[in-house]
Curated annotation (Swiss-Prot):
Chlorophyll a PD1 binds at H197. Chlorophyll a ChlzD1 binds at H117. The gene is psbA3. Signal peptide: none annotated. It comes from the Bacteria. Belongs to the reaction center PufL/M/PsbA/D family. Residues 344-358 form a propeptide. Cyanobacteria usually contain more than 2 copies of the psbA gene. This is Photosystem II protein D1 3. [CaMn4O5] cluster binds at D169, E188, H331, E332, D341, A343. Gene3D superfamilies: Photosystem II protein D1-like. PSII is composed of 1 copy each of membrane proteins PsbA, PsbB, PsbC, PsbD, PsbE, PsbF, PsbH, PsbI, PsbJ, PsbK, PsbL, PsbM, PsbT, PsbX, PsbY, PsbZ, Psb30/Ycf12, peripheral proteins PsbO, CyanoQ (PsbQ), PsbU, PsbV and a large number of cofactors. It forms dimeric complexes.
């Protein structure tokens, strides 16, 4: 080692380490990237192959397989990688645990392969963001912001199946499968009435509003550096020291549009809010899904409001309850699991009132 250093020569391992951690590479690899790249490649390759050609999967564990691939009659909208069978439950199900490849495919082993590699890959991607920020001397807030969508993926692909007792309850990897997951989640957990979901909606929609407001304000107060016949965008030079827009003008406009203290006079605190608002909202949504995974559900307004004559006063909660019961009846209808709230001896009071005829 000492001889190699003195002579200026590096071993193969040292050269590899230097290349992996070199921030001058066109694309930074990093040690987290060494884990991320093969995992995401494996997940992507398996997902594409399964989406195109995977055979039907016995998702409910009742020998009634559900087809999700394109070659079995689906299109881009209806296709999905179907979650692993309810007969597998939470068991780790690699290829070598099945008696044959056909059995592994029938029980939905592809779903576990894709999801586990994907979760490891996106977790390593967050680590890679921190690693590159550290090596460049930047603050670590980029990976903190990325932790919001990462936590959401962990919630629907890992925490929720663990709470429900089977990976068959995980979110299918497809467009209509995602919508089905959302409808069933509402039917079983009343997520619309959960305060954490409400905070998540405020975070996502509020973040979109703030982003649009900020972008439009900046674009409307650019410092003109070009002639009338040229685009404003040509007046910006990459790396220029001076501000590209007039923050005083933007502050004055917005302060007069609403009120003075609704407008930021500090660009740094403004951009912190733009980053923190949606991130905190998505964190709350992830926590909400994680708590509902263990059946700590949204607010339950089963008792309808009655007037002095005993007549139902319809509310939004009644509409949500009726919709939830309908979705619950349609879910897994071949598994013959009748919803418990419809199978009880005492009927659940909902806003159902027969119209007067004649």
């Amino acid at each position: 080692m000492a001889t190699a250093v003195r002579s200026g020569r590096l071993s193969s391992w040292q050269s590899f380490c230097q290349w992996v951690t070199d921030t001058n590479n066109r694309i930074y690899i990093g040690w987290f990237g060494v884990l991320m790249i093969p995992c995401l490649l494996a997940a992507t390759t398996c997902f594409i192959v399964a989406f195109i050609a995977a055979p039907p999967v016995d998702i409910d564990g009742i020998r009634e397989p559900v087809a999700g691939s394109l070659l079995y009659g689906n299109n881009i909208i209806s296709g999905a990688v179907v979650p692993s069978s309810n007969a597998i439950g939470l068991h780790f199900y690699p290829i070598w645990d099945a008696a044959s490849l056909d059995e592994w495919l029938y029980n939905g082993g592809t779903y576990q392969l894709v999801v586990f590699h994907f979760l490891i890959g996106i977790s390593a991607y967050m680590g890679r963001q921190w690693e590159l920020s550290y090596r460049l001397g930047m603050r670590p807030w980029i990976c903190v912001a990325y932790s919001a969508p990462l936590s959401a993926a962990m919630a629907v692909f890992l925490v929720y199946p663990f709470g429900q007792g089977s990976f068959s309850d995980g979110m299918p990897l497809g467009i209509s499968g995602t919508f089905n997951f959302m409808l069933v989640f509402q039917a079983e957990h009343n997520i619309l009435m959960h305060p954490f979901h409400m905070l998540g909606v405020a975070g996502v929609f509020g973040g979109s509003l703030f982003s649009a407001m900020h972008g439009s304000l900046v674009t409307s107060s650019l410092v003109r550096e070009t002639t009338e016949n040229e685009s404003h965008n040509y007046g910006y030079k990459f790396g220029q020291e001076e501000e590209t827009y007039n923050i005083v003008a933007a502050h004055g406009y917005f302060g007069r549009l609403i009120f003075q203290y609704a407008s930021f006079n500090n660009s740094r605190s403004l951009h912190f809010l733009l980053g923190a608002w949606p991130v905190v909202g998505i964190w709350f949504t992830s926590m909400g899904v994680s708590t509902m995974a263990f059946n700590l559900n949204g607010f339950n307004f089963n008792q309808s409001i009655l007037d002095s004559q005993g007549r139902v006063l319809n509310t939004w909660a009644d509409m949500v309850n009726r919709a939830g019961l309908g979705m619950e009846v349609m879910h897994e209808r071949n598994a013959h699991n009748f919803p418990l709230d419809l199978a009880t001896v005492e009927s659940t009071p909902v806003a159902l009132q027969a119209p007067a005829i004649g």
